[in-house]
Amino acid sequence: MKKNKLKILDCTLRDGGYYNNWDFPRELIEEYLQAMSAAKIEYVELGFRFFKKDIYLGPCAYTTSSFVETLNIPKKLKIGIMINAKDILSNKLSKSKIKKVFFNFPKKNKISFVRFACHINEISKIIPICNELNKQKITTAINLMQISEISDSEIERISKLAANSKLDIFY
């Protein structure tokens, strides 16, 4: 991991999707992207990448590469998605199915970063996935959840593991 200056990530659509099932009107998404660009926000997390659900969820619940490709994204914005580590680690699907759903990025790809939400016991399994994504020129981040429930020694141990990986961001 490299030490860099402070970066701002906006996750309004991803986080706000809990209120409307990630079903934002296209016009709102594009106006939002223009506003983020005008505000000089560099990183925008458009939504999650979930497996298909039995209930209706809007496009920002799946944030497929094909959906992102249809958006008018200002040049300086870096677009990303969030993936819950449990969705890929606890799923009984084959590795090829998981790769197809979660990591099927075209060569010319508008998604430039993936942020994983992880519990401490998931991090060592997600780091190799981050390393693979880095080979595709995708910036990777791990968000350590429920950190207040973790001992200082465990935080130190997992931080060293992250620091010795190709992971770009760990917090």
Question: Where do the PLM segments sit?
Answer:
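Conserved, mostly hydrophobic/aromatic
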Residues: 16, 36, 114
